[in-house]
Amino acid sequence: MKPVAARVALFDLDHTLLPIDSDHAWGVFTTTIGWTDPVGFARRNDEFYAHYKAGTLDIHDYVRFAVDAVRRQGRDAALAARERFMADVVAPALREPALALVQAHRQAGDELVIVTATNEFVTRPIATAFGVEELVAVELALGPDGWINGEIRGVPSAREGKVTRMEQWLAARNLDWEDVECTFYSDSVNDLPLLDKVAHPVATNPDDRLRALAKERGWRILDLFEKT
């Protein structure tokens, strides 16, 4: 058997390391600061979230919707709002069991990667809060002015796209799946393609469908906290 070159711990973010959905929470936050209509935006935000949970989300449509306010407000206002979002919403949602899980893999010498279907604008500072440098998130295309234009750059890291993006991540390091021993923590059946790919899938705070599947397949189940 070929020896592995590295051990890699992969973490989904929303409802896995966080008890909230950061993408949805950011949308709610934009209504509280007056960037979006609280009724119309909330309705569409909830509709997109329902599609995500059902596995029917069109991520391109969603990202256009989700980053529209950021695009319109411009860089300086968006970065200032994100800093406030981190302080008011994300920081109170950080939980010791999740921080300890990441730290345990760090102390074991594992490479740490957050792999999320939420966009990089929202998730980069969250990854930093967990002390994780490697972030595989939905990358946002930039317009001629160097600011977000509402489109996705490259392959979105959702569903099967998480496998593709991780393969790109590995290839950039001259590695393949055979070269690494991967553990992946996720709460959602949407992540089944990547859970199936890794050596050690861990159903973490799993939704009902993933919990049932994990029991059927004998996968480890980890409950870090109650979802909100």
Descriptions of predicted regions:
Residues 1-57:
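Active-site neighborhood of HAD-like aspartate-dependent phosphohydrolases
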Residues 2-8, 80, 87-228:
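C-terminal cap/substrate-recognition subdomain and adjoining C-terminal extension
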Residues 48-75, 139-144:
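Short, compositionally biased "basic patch" segments
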Residues 25-26, 47, 61-65, 81-85:
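A general alpha-helix detector
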Residues 13, 76-79:
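Catalytic cores of transferase enzymes with a strong primary signal for eukaryotic protein kinases
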Residues 20, 42, 56, 60, ...:
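Electropositive phosphate-/nucleotide-binding environments in soluble metabolic enzymes
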